[in-house]
A protein has these predicted regions:
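Thr-Gly-centered strand-to-loop micro-motif
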Residues: 9, 34, 272, 329, ...
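Radical SAM enzyme [4Fe-4S]-AdoMet core and its adjacent flexible, acidic
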Residues: 12, 206-227, 273, 336-367
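Conserved, mostly hydrophobic/aromatic
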Residues: 160, 180, 197, 232, ...
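Terminal RNA-binding accessory module
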Residues: 344-437
């Protein structure tokens, strides 16, 4: 055994997938995982910088690790991910106890860099981004035993004015379809029952290499033996096609859940955000989804407090929310990100106004979610058993194909089983029920 490592992951599912590839390299080098900071010989923080709160958490944790390193000077401490890409050497200037800073395009170099630092103790900063690089054949140490994250592409070409992602993840680069399918097959062979295909905008998959588009890839993955559920995220509304909708409709294992971030319900703000669609265009795409996939769940993201937002804009968004009736909406306060066009826009919205509007938005959505779930009372749904509930070990937790959490009494079922559950107590965020035996 070379030593022990601990990795902390902040941010999106893509960061989780990157961290699994980092862990794979460390384990291949002889390191074993520990959850105890004091026992670790290597500590990594895989970071996010989409919102200021994410960066604040990282800086707080960096301060904690400084105290650990004072008692364990041989500890190797590295910062990876989007915040590492954005800040680079600034992180080391601010916190000299950091040994290396590794950008989003250098995940594959982790094993080598850790070995070099262990031997030479020379600090490293590597945040170079190759516009075309897609690394394959990295060892993967997956978390869990049921659901596997499978990146299909990296980067983003959309440049929404509020978003830092294109600057820290680079331009879109798609993996070759045969590489994605091979990874899914390996996951199935390892016992995984569900895969989630990941990308900043999965609907753009394949535009760079032309070998297959996202609908083609979905069909290939749907055919992999042993995989019972196929999910994907995230979709940009401008790129969702009738071909993709038909592929989901005709698939066997493709789940009837589409996350389609609208971000706002006012054309004026959508234009300022550079979302390149209108409310009307989004509405039509959502209509096509619901027409082809009755019973599918539609979820979204919404940002409150974008620069220049007026009460009239916000009222339009509330009206749009009531019209769309999403199963769930992930709501966020606008976070000013230096280097993005929105950060320099006039009429930044005061924090107290942002918070008040967010509360109003969430109240409307909670009411909608509760009403939609109430419509499932007495329905029988297929649930994949994921494990014990966080709050009660006597209760199983699982999800439907439409991505709704279902809680039901612990019986003879095992993790990974697929069971039929009758819904008896619909709630805003979860469904409670009983197994149909």
């Amino acid at each position: 055994m070379r030593g022990r490592y601990k990795i902390l992951v902040y941010g999106c599912q893509m960061n989780v997938a990157d961290a699994e590839r980092m862990e794979g390299q460390l384990q291949a080098a002889g390191y074993v995982r520990t959850e105890k900071t004091a026992d670790a010989d290597v500590i990594l923080i895989n970071t996010c910088c989409v919102r200021e709160t994410a960066e604040d958490k990282v800086y707080g944790k960096i301060g904690e690790i400084k105290k650990v390193k004072e008692h364990h000077p041989q500890l190797i401490f590295g910062i990876t991910g989007c915040m590492a890409q954005k800040e680079g050497e600034n992180l080391m200037r601010r916190a000299p106890h950091i040994d290396f800073v590794l950008g989003t395009g250098k995940v594959q170099e982790l094993g080598r860099i850790v070995a070099e630092i262990a031997a030479e103790r020379a600090p490293v900063v590597d945040v170079a981004l190759d516009a075309h690089a897609v690394e394959e054949d990295l060892p993967i140490a997956r978390g869990g035993t049921l659901s596997a994250w499978v990146p299909i592409m990296y980067g983003c070409n959309n440049y929404c004015t509020y978003c830092i992602v294109p600057y820290v993840r680079g331009r879109e680069r798609s993996r070759m379809p045969e590489e994605v399918v091979a990874e899914v097959r390996r996951a199935a062979a390892d016992g995984y029952r569900e895969v989630t295909l990941l990308g900043q905008n999965v609907n753009s998959y394949g535009k760079d290499h032309g070998q297959a588009d996202f609908a083609d890839l979905l069909r290939m993955v749907d055919a992999v033996e042993g995989i019972r559920r196929v999910r994907f995220m995230t979709s940009h509304p401008k790129d969702i096609s009738d071909k993709l909708i038909d592929t989901i409709k005709n698939g066997t294992h493709i789940c009837e859940h589409i996350h389609l971030p609208v971000q706002y319900g006012s054309n004026r703000i959508l234009k300022a955000m550079n979302r390149v669609y209108t409310v009307e265009q989004y509405r039509e795409r959502a209509r096509r989804v619901r027409e082809a996939l009755p019973g599918a769940s539609l979820t979204t993201d919404l940002i409150v407090g974008f620069p220049g937002e007026t009460e009239e804009d916000f009222a339009e968004t509330l009206d749009f929310l009531r019209e769309m009736r999403y199963d769930a909406a992930y709501t966020f306060l606008y976070s000013k990100r230096s280097g993005t066009p929105a950060a320099a826009m006039a009429a930044q919205v005061p924090d107290e106004v942002k918070h008040a509007r967010l509360e109003r938005l969430m109240a409307v959505q909670n009411e909608i979610s509760r009403a939609i779930n109430e419509g499932l009372r007495s329905a029988q749904v297929e649930v994949m058993v994921e494990g014990a509930s966080k709050n009660d070990p006597a209760v199983w937790s699982g999800r439907t194909r439409t991505n709704k959490i279902v809680l039901f009494p612990h019986g003879a079922e095992r993790v990974g089983d697929f069971v039929q559950v009758k819904i008896t107590q619909p709630q805003t965020w979860v469904l409670k029920g009983e197994v149909v035996r």
